[in-house]
Amino acid sequence: MSKQQMRPSKFSDIVGQKDVVDRLNIVVRGCISSDGVMPHTLIDGPPGLGKTTIASAIANELNVNLYTLNAANIRNVKNILPYLMGMAPRSVVFIDEIHRLPKTVEEFLYPVMEDFVLNITVENKPENIDLPMFTMIGATTSGGSLSQPFYDRFTIKEHLSFYDENELAKLARSNLSKMGIVLEDSDLLEIAQRSKGTPRILNARLQWYKNYKICHPNDNKSIGEIFDIQGIDSKGLDLYDRMYLETLQKSKGNPLGLKSISSITGIAIETIENSIEPYLVRKGFIIRTQKGRILGKP
């Protein structure tokens, strides 16, 4: 089953992030009632918590076109112009990893977002081109990396939090049902406990479970044993997590910086910051200090 098939299409289908979804639903209903345009929206939070899902649900609720871009692929203004000039009125333009936009593109978007006007140069002459009113939705794992003027142009700002285990178990039940799989509540909870509070990781765990049962239909291994084979322990830690923690353990209490950890483990700094550390910090496995990272006492 594809990610798109697993992804909720409406607010009512989204499990978790209730406060965020409720607030956005109020704004969306108000826009529909007043025949208005959804304000520009910034969604911040760790990877895999549903930023893309929420953006897609907003467009579906508004019944408007959705244009999806990744800022990593936008190197200059020319990369984004076709979308801005070709979009239908009231469209949603969703930019994932928006903190990666070059500053020149950020600055170009100021009048686009504020006045719905393109300021471009044609044959060495400045021209202003009116655009249809639209909604820009930005997703980021690093809201503080946006320039202040760009950040301020997002009227709505929401932060996504990690899921609790009961929410993930509920989501697991829903997604497994789409695969034709039914599990006991205790098994659902155990999978949830191994998913780091993150729906994207949960879905990867579910896919592993499904594949394992396809290959071993008569196997009676427990949930724990099935995930032990994948290298996922009872706390959800994987090979990279353990490499990270073992590196700190070998430092014998001496703080290690990101560059040192990356050099020793071979794991990219961005992966450490965005995918490994948030969960380890939240669960108390590590402590960030001014001098570097040290082991905590979970």
Give the positions of each predicted feature:
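Dynamic helix-loop-helix/coil hinge segments at AAA+ ATPase domain boundaries and subdomain interfaces
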Residues: 2-23, 233-235
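Conserved AAA+ ATPase core "coupling" helix
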Residues: 25, 145-179, 184-193, 204-205
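Walker A/P-loop
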Residues: 29-71, 82-89
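Conserved AAA+/SF3 P-loop NTPase catalytic/coupling segment centered on the Walker-B
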Residues: 57-58, 77, 89-120, 143-153
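AAA+/SF3 P-loop NTPase mechanochemical coupling elements
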Residues: 122-139, 154
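Conserved C-terminal helix/linker of AAA+ ATPases
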Residues: 188-189, 206, 210-233, 241, ...
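C-terminal helical "lid" of AAA+/P-loop NTPase domains
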Residues: 189-194, 200-215, 243-246, 260, ...
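Terminal-proximal interaction/regulatory segments of ATP-powered molecular machines
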Residues: 252-298
